[in-house]
UniProtKB/Swiss-Prot annotation:
Assigned protein family: Belongs to the UPF0342 family.
Name by which UniProt lists this protein: UPF0342 protein STH1710
InterPro entries in alphabetical order: Com_YlbF (IPR010368), YheA/YmcA-like_dom_sf (IPR023378)
Organism: Symbiobacterium thermophilum (strain DSM 24528 / JCM 14929 / IAM 14863 / T)
Phylogenetic lineage: Bacteria, Bacillati, Bacillota, Clostridia, Eubacteriales
Gene3D superfamilies given in the database record: YheA/YmcA-like
Length: 112
């Protein structure tokens, strides 16, 4: 079983999604302002996700605020590339989790 898991890990590291993410991350490293903006964006996303998980409905103002922040961030091409690569890698990993969850018929919250 562990050999298969290691094979999957190697395949993920060889995927275009992972390679693109690594390349985009390298462009961001050493740019403190870009790193901070991305961290602030992620923090705001997580705060809003936490509210949703608590059963609260986001206001239009909250949604628009996050969208405005995102639109400011993507003006920097390196940040835009990073966020897009991060999203593609996240989708790939989510798909893999879903496939595994369905294969073993376990209802895990992150496979939905």
């Amino acid at each position: 079983m562990y050999d298969h898991a290691h094979s999957l890990a190697r395949a993920l590291k060889e995927s275009q999604e992972y390679k693109s993410f690594q390349a985009a991350r390298e462009k961001i490293k050493g740019k403190p302002a870009a790193e901070q903006m991305i961290a602030d964006f992620h923090k705001r996303q997580m705060e809003l996700q936490a509210e949703v998980l608590q059963g609260k409905e986001l206001t239009q103002e909250q949604k628009e605020g996050l969208e405005r922040l995102y639109n400011v961030l993507i003006q920097d091409l390196d940040i835009r590339d990073y966020l897009m690569a991060e999203q593609r890698l996240g989708t790939l990993l989510s798909d893999v989790y879903k496939i595994i969850g369905e294969a073993v018929d376990v209802d895990l919250p992150f496979t939905k």
